[in-house]
Amino acid sequence: MADTFETLTATDALARFSEGSLSPETLVEDCLTRIERDNPKVNAFTCINGEEARRLAAESARRWQAGSPCGPLDGIPVTIKDLTLTKGLPTRLGSTTTATDGPWEVDAPISRHLRNAGAIVVGKTTSPEFGWKGVTDNPLHGITRNPWNTELTPGGSSGGAGAAAALNLGLLHQGSDAGGSIRIPCSFTGTFGIKPTFGWVPQWPASTMSTLSHLGPMTRTARDSALMLSVMAQPDARDGYVGNPTGPDWLTPPPASLSGWRIAFSANLGYVEVAPDIAQRVEEAIAYLEALGATVERIDPGFSDPLKTFNTLWFAGATQALEKLNEQQQAALDPGFLEIARRGQDVSLSAYLAARRERSELTAHMAAFHERYDL
């Protein structure tokens, strides 16, 4: 029976590389073949990096055969979002207003970290223009579709990564998230993602969304996201917010028993309307945690809907994209993005600073709240 890699995890692939039952060349070739077959159905990729991926896979195979992998992701096919600089590959931000010929001569920190760990970039994934919304379509690449039902969206803004993860077109996928752009696609495509705490993962160039924007992993399993995050969460001198983090060992398996753990649970944060089927699934997860011995306290965190504060910061960030565009270029933008960017021009400095203060106060409130709980 022929080997199939449509559900293979990065964790299992690395184990098979080590034991010699799988070669990076075989895995990368299979991945590229399936991208060629499946991408026309979902439009998850902005570009394919086939020639370089095959060359790097051959080099990785030789290292594994010699028993000397270059890093914790050696030979693993990965994708990078179109908002993230990737040396040698176009970064167009989903926009016809960006340069068609680069130059793309430098890696963003996470692109460099992944490559230094041995990961092989097989392509870049789609985003709405400048990552502005929770569905994925843009004037440059068109509509990205959900693999579960191509009449539906995979969400956004990391919709290409979500669709690629669902189809395992690459085993690890990079996303970014300011207002749900990892969390929404993962929920729409049945995949797993993390918006890490700001300051764990370096980001450069700086996002127009300032500290709202975080970079993180999107995968098919929690363990693969932990593996990817352990590589992404390394310092880089270009991001002064990231010093030398000494975070948790994300790869250590959780304890078999949660006896003694205190877990805070809010079904709706005190203000959100939750779909009944989703609420039921979450209740099942809570029951499972209780069965493992945890004490679950049902409590709302004690803050009101922060949407107004978020929108002030979001609109002000969006308007920065207009500063370098002439009238003709602005006319070519996604009309929805142009609308919120122009609304951002009406945000006063006082309103912006007030929103920053409100966010800081909420951060402090939640930090104190979490001090009382393990989870």
Give the role of each language-model region.
Residues 192-280, 284-285, 328, 361:
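A short helix-breaking turn/cap at a secondary-structure junction
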Residues 13-19, 98-102, 213-220, 342-347:
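Short, well-ordered beta-strand elements within core beta-sheets of diverse protein domains
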Residues 1-55, 291-292:
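An N-terminal boundary/leader segment
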Residues 24-29, 58, 249, 253, ...:
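Acyltransferase
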Residues 60-77, 224, 254-264:
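Immediate post-signal peptide segment of exported/extracytoplasmic ligand-binding proteins
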Residues 53-55, 63-140:
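Acidic/His- and Gly-rich active-site-bordering loop/insert found
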Residues 74-93, 257-266, 315-369:
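Short helix-loop capping/hinge segments that flank enzyme active sites or metal/cofactor-binding pockets
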Residues 104-236:
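Short glycine/serine-rich loop segments
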